[in-house]
Each structure stands twice: as C-alpha cells, then as structure tokens.
Amino acid sequence: VALLKRAQALGFPVAPTWVVDLEEEFFRLNNLEERLEALFRGVFGVRIDEERLLLASEEAVRAVRESYLLPERAEAFLEVLKGKGPFLLRYAGEGALERARTPREALFALKRLYSERFRVEAVLQRHPRLIPPFTPVLVQEAEEAAEDPFLSLDLSRALGREVVVFAHQGLLVRVESPYGG
C-alpha cells in the first residue's frame, strides 16, 4: 500500500483502490478464532495427524465461507463499489488474488480470500500459528495485472531503487521488489 501511495504521490497513475480492513471484526463477530482452534485441536502433536489436518482444513474453509459480515458492512462495501468493476482483490503485500466482475462477486471474493488462509498448505506454512495476522485486503478496479517493464523502469528511477510494477491499461496495480514481496 505504501509503495502504491508513494507512486501516486510521484504522479504515477494508480488503479482505483479501496483498502478493506474487516478481517479482524469478521473473525471476532463470528467467533472464528475459537471455532477454528477447536477444529485443529489434536492435529499438531509429536507428529502431524494428516487425516485430521485434511478434515480440519476442509471444515475451517467451510466455516469461514459460511460466516457473515455485519449487514451494514456488507451494504457499505457494495455501495462503495456500485457501478464499478471488474475487480482484483488481494491481501496487502501479497500477490495471490481473486477476481470479481461485480461488487457482489467482490464480496464473495473477499470471503474466499479469508477462507484460503485455512487450506492445508497455508496452515502448514504458518504452523505453529493457526490464525494468521489480520491484514487489509486491497480491492482494485482492474481486470488483470501484468508486469509492465516500462513503468517498472520509470518508477524504479523515481524511487531510487529497483521495483517491479504490475499494471492494467497503464494503471499501477501492484509494486514489489524484484526479489519477491
């Protein structure tokens, strides 16, 4: 987010971007932390119980997807994005993304992002921590983001350090280090 803001301040065109910081509230109001910890209880002992891990992960993904945002939060989300689209959604600082054509699809994509953090690979990567740090999600009005070598060169010069720019129709969508992240 900081690099996108800096690029915009330097006069580079940035895709319309909304920062959605609802994950902590979503988890708290749906009692997800306790529910998910209960699902994974007994999975990680001296050895990882792979069968229980698979079942717990499946149930965790389902629990997150079936949980609700506060109605007023969902309505505000839809209202802000009304008449806009398509969208790319991703966690700030991460490259993996979800696509959505409409605001309603973007709302479902937001919950998919939340639930993906409980797939087996993601859980194992974070172990021993089950609940990931709550991170804002960027919702960007763009259809696709591809590496743009010309914008990368221009922004690298302006910032005084090497960066890689991903853009959609000349608008910056993501800026990252050439070494990842």
Regions picked out by a protein language model, each given a short descriptive name:
Residues 147-164:
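Conserved, well-ordered active-site substructure
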Residues 1-147, 152:
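N-terminal beta-alpha lobe that positions the nucleotide/phosphoryl donor
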Residues 167-181:
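Conserved catalytic alpha/beta cores of large enzymes that bind or transform nucleotide phosphates
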Residues 87-91, 162-168:
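Short, hydrophobic/proline-enriched secondary-structure or compact coil segments at domain edges
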Residues 8-11, 162, 170-172:
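Low-complexity, intrinsically disordered short peptide segments enriched in small/polar/basic residues
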